[in-house]
């Protein structure tokens, strides 16, 4: 039976291609039917679409310059983040580069072509591995269906298409190992590791873990006599090839290493329990094995039910040969999935998520390839064992579904179909396999229907409309900036009215080629992340997703923001000193709106001078509001002798202090308790903060009458959110009745609760202006500990006001201080005039260089509103000058009296060293290849000589 189904490569390729086309049409055809693109999810517009457009333009320019003999690739871009190196967004995937260049004007089509072609290549890679390891061709064809069309791919990778490359690289990497060990051919292995070295570092780390495990398990299971010496001999060749590949990739790998270690990407502030998850996670794991639900964070499996039978078939078979390897891997992956330690280990303890479950998909697919032929030759006793374990699994699934209060997935019907096929058609094995292939295909269609169909899970609603997606990537609000006739270098900002739009318009600058004070990149510079947290910026999705600087007047001016766009119909926080200069009628998703363009009347260029400085140690003692005002008076430095020290002066006033705010909250809660006859309040004020027993609690703060004009802030210092569930607060929920019935009802409701990776949202509103801040909970994926939070309501005229605070998140909110601030703008104009007296003119950015001219009457500190980074080198009149970190995340250098030419040059840190290492390694590989060819040639000649002698 094994030999009868060993097909030629051509036949397998034709059958696979036909099958892929049919399944792709059935699964993704509904996107065309419903008018949806393949750009969707939380990061679809801001990262997937933005990356396609940016890389398309970048590589068009790069290859265009190359054709004209100009080799000076851009490695730094002011539009990337707040001004960062392009490695944050640059991709090295050849297919994505081609798609980007071909479809730069139609990113939606480019993403679709890239995604579907990547899936096709992933299937080819899987089949190549199966063929080399002598798997049954038909079983491989059945398994490849499950490898490509599963819950992980359909729920996650379609929206985050960069992760599809893992499905291509993993089988090729393991195929490379087999070729290296069996044939001493290292080409494929080196190519895979090289690509991982220039790609995402996290992918390299994860694949290295899998590779290490593969080599260890391979040696232990395939060698009867085991020893340390034998193991070292087994892995020496892969280790050398691995190092050669990393050395070859050093020109990109070393700069990426520097980028990662100097970034603000954070994991948990406090690592929680490493051994056990909450009950809800294990319930999700059981149902998510063949279902569509998420497991933990970004974790999906949704494998074919045929894999369930294959698992039970595996563990009822004798542990010999490949069966033994698969059993060991099953235990390893089970432990990874069952323990939080596995999640931390898969990310190098830099985060907490379950993306590593893609490895389980590969495992289950290989399991089907190996076990399907054996199932068709199984005896009665083994069938009974498999069916017994299957029955236990089904009972567990039913119990968990009842516990979760969810319906049992009708995907289980396919499990019975597979079992029936196995029982009835086993004697006609070839016919049985054809039926299994049809069932597997139908199962894929059902899975896709469950996930995407609007009447089911409706995940397709998360994807952008195909008619408007390209315009949405560019962002409608940016269109008015094209009318600006201004040759100077400046930044722009787009003001939106709610958190949803903030998230949709993340990476605003990068998507339009404009410079702005935002950025959504996994490896944002640590100085940027630390500064925005220190300043209490509330408009952040997570520590490295900065929407903007919250429309704060001083921060915009100090950052070189000159123009703003805003919809007239939206109620937004407007900074002080901006003048309306243009209006434009636009169509925003079917709604007629008026787009407005404002110009900052107090705009500073990217480079301006200070005559005084404030020591960083003094600056750190100030509250977020004072820090903003201090930077208008003196540049913040560690220390300097270039300019005198300045003691900042403040004119802000706290119109409500902590005691007043907490008193008002207590009165509201007492009134609510009296009205609802509650013994225990839904929200309690303690000495260290607030305990919120119910989510969605709305608090109202009455501000003093006859407010004077100024910028208004709500500031909360050292805020920390500790999530709690209903069981934690059962005393509150059972205060009216404590019957067994009430307790059971509470228990049922609490099953949907989880304290893992929880986040709260604090929404504030003043005079119709709403601001929402995301607050990640203790031990969550992006927990950074306590932080300052400042909500800016913009510049408001003298009016009465009532400030509302809505706490969306059950748990404890601890803080050291809370107050409402009025910041008058009386001194702002004077401070601006002082800063704008001596500025750098004729600023130009070209070929990784920033140049400009300045004339000063005395010694001053020149502040450069570009994020500080080691890659910059400064020259004043051609002489190298030391750059200092200023104002938390910007740069500064001293300038003497007189006229000066300023030049900043950017080089990727580690690029020169990496170039040398890559060059040396390339020569080593070439020399080794030449020697190998000569050796083979000599062996061939020797064999020919001996043959002639015998003749």
Predicted regions and their residues:
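A cross-kingdom signal targeting lumenal/periplasmic-facing segments of multi-pass membrane
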Residues: 98-99, 514-616, 620-629, 633-674, ...
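Contiguous transmembrane helix-bundle modules in multi-pass membrane proteins
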Residues: 184, 324-341, 345-470, 764, ...
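Membrane-interface coil-to-helix junctions
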Residues: 23-123, 145-167, 260-265, 273-298, ...
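Membrane-interface helix-loop junctions at the exits of transmembrane helices
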Residues: 25-33, 94-108, 138-160, 248-261, ...
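Membrane-embedded helix bundles of polyisoprenyl
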Residues: 16, 20-22, 115-132, 137-222, ...
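Periplasmic/ER-lumenal interhelical loops and adjacent helix-loop junctions
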Residues: 45-68, 72, 90, 94, ...
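Extracytoplasmic/lumenal acceptor-recognition loop(s) of multi-pass membrane glycoenzymes
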Residues: 69, 77-88, 442-467, 482-558, ...
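Active-site-proximal, structured, solvent-exposed surfaces of multi-pass membrane proteins
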Residues: 2-9, 51-52, 656-951
């Amino acid at each position: 039976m094994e030999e009868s189904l060993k097909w030629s490569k051509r036949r397998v390729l034709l059958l696979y291609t036909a099958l892929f086309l049919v399944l792709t049409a059935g699964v993704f055809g509904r996107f065309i039917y419903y008018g949806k693109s393949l750009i969707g999810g939380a990061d679809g517009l801001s990262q997937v679409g933005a990356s396609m457009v940016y890389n398309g333009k970048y590589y068009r320019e790069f290859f265009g310059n190359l054709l004209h003999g100009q080799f000076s690739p851009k490695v730094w871009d002011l539009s990337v983040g707040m001004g960062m190196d392009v490695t944050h967004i640059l991709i090295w995937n050849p297919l994505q580069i081609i798609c980007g260049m071909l479809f730069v004007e139609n990113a939606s089509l480019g993403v679709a072509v890239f995604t579907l072609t990547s899936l096709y290549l992933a299937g080819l890679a899987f089949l190549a591995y199966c063929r080399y390891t002598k798997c049954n061709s038909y079983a491989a064809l059945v398994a490849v269906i499950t490898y490509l069309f599963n819950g992980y791919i359909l729920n996650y990778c379609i929206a985050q298409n960069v992760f599809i490359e893992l499905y291509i690289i993993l089988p090729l990497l393991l195929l490379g190992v087999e070729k290296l060990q069996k044939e001493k051919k290292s080409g494929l292995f080196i190519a895979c590791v090289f690509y991982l070295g220039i790609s995402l570092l996290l992918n390299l780390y994860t694949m290295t873990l899998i590779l290490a495990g593969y080599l260890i398990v391979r040696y232990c299971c395939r060698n009867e006599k085991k020893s340390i010496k034998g193991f070292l001999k087994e892995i020496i060749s892969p280790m050398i090839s691995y190092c050669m590949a990393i050395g070859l990739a050093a020109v990109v790998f070393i700069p990426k290493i520097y980028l990662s270690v100097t970034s603000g990407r954070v994991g948990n502030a406090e690592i929680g329990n490493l051994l056990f998850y909450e009950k809800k996670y294990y319930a999700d794991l059981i149902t998510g094995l063949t279902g569509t639900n998420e497991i933990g964070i970004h974790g999906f499996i949704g494998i074919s039910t045929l894999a369930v039978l294959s698992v039970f078939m595996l563990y009822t078979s004798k542990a010999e040969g490949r069966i033994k390897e698969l059993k060991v891997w099953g235990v390893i992956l089970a432990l990874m999935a069952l323990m939080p330690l596995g999640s931390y280990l898969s990310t190098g303890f830099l985060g907490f998520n379950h993306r590593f479950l893609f490895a389980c998909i590969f495992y289950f697919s290989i399991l089907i390839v190996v076990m399907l032929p054996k199932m068709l030759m199984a005896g009665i006793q083994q069938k009974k064992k498999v069916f017994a374990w299957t029955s236990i699994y089904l009972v567990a699934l039913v119990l968990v579904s009842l516990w979760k209060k969810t319906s049992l997935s009708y995907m289980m019907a396919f499990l019975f179909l597979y079992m029936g096929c196995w029982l009835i058609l086993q004697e006609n094995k070839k016919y049985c396999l054809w039926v299994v292939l049809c069932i597997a295909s139908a199962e894929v269609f059902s899975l896709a229907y469950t996930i995407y169909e609007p009447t089911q899970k409706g995940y397709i609603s998360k994807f952008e409309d195909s008619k408007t997606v390209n315009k949405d990537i560019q962002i409608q609000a940016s269109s008015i900036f094209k009318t600006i006739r201004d040759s100077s270098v400046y930044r722009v900002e787009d003001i939106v009215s709610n958190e949803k739009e903030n998230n949709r318009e993340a990476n605003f600058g990068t998507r339009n080629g404009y410079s702005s004070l935002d950025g959504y990149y996994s490896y944002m510079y640590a100085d940027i992340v630390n500064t925005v947290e220190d300043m209490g910026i509330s408009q952040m999705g997570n520590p490295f997703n900065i929407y903007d600087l919250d429309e704060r007047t001083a921060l915009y001016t100090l950052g070189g923001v000159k123009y703003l766009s805003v919809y007239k119909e939206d109620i937004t926080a407007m900074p002080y000193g901006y003048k309306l200069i243009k209006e434009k009628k636009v169509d925003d998703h079917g709604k007629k709106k008026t787009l407005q363009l404002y110009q900052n009347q107090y705009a500073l260029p990217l480079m301006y001078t200070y005559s005084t400085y404030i020591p960083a140690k003094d600056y750190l003692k100030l509250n977020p509001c004072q820090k903003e005002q201090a930077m208008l008076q003196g540049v913040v430095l560690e220390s300097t002798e270039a300019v005198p020290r300045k003691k900042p002066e403040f004119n802000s006033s706290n119109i409500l202090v902590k005691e007043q705010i907490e008193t008002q909250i207590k009165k509201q809660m007492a009134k609510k308790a009296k009205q609802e006859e509650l013994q225990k309040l839904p929200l309690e004020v303690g000495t260290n903060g607030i305990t919120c027993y119910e989510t969605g609690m709305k608090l109202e703060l009455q501000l003093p009458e006859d407010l004077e004009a100024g910028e208004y802030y709500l500031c909360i210092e050292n805020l920390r959110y500790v999530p709690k569930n209903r069981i934690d607060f059962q005393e509150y929920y059972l205060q009216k009745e404590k019957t067994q019935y009430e307790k059971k009802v509470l228990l049922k409701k609490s099953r949907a609760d989880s304290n893992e990776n929880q986040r709260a949202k604090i929404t504030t509103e003043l005079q119709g202006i709403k601001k929402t801040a995301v607050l990640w909970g203790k031990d969550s994926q992006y927990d950074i500990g306590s932080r300052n939070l400042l909500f800016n309501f913009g510049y408001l005229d003298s009016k009465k006001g009532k400030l509302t605070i809505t706490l969306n998140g059950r748990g404890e909110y601890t803080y050291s201080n809370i107050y409402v601030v009025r910041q008058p703008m009386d001194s702002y104009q004077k401070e601006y005039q002082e800063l704008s007296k001596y500025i750098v003119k004729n600023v130009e950015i070209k070929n990784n260089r920033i140049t400009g001219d300045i004339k000063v009457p005395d010694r001053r500190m020149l502040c450069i509103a570009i994020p500080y980074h080691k890659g910059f080198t400064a020259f004043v009149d051609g002489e190298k000058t030391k750059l200092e970190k200023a104002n938390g995340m910007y740069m500064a250098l001293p300038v003497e009296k007189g006229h000066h030419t300023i030049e900043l040059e950017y080089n990727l840190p580690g690029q020169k060293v990496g170039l040398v290492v890559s060059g040396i390694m390339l020569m080593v590989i070439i020399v080794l290849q030449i020697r190998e060819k000569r050796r083979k040639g000599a062996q061939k000649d020797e064999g020919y000589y001996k043959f002639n002698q015998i003749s």
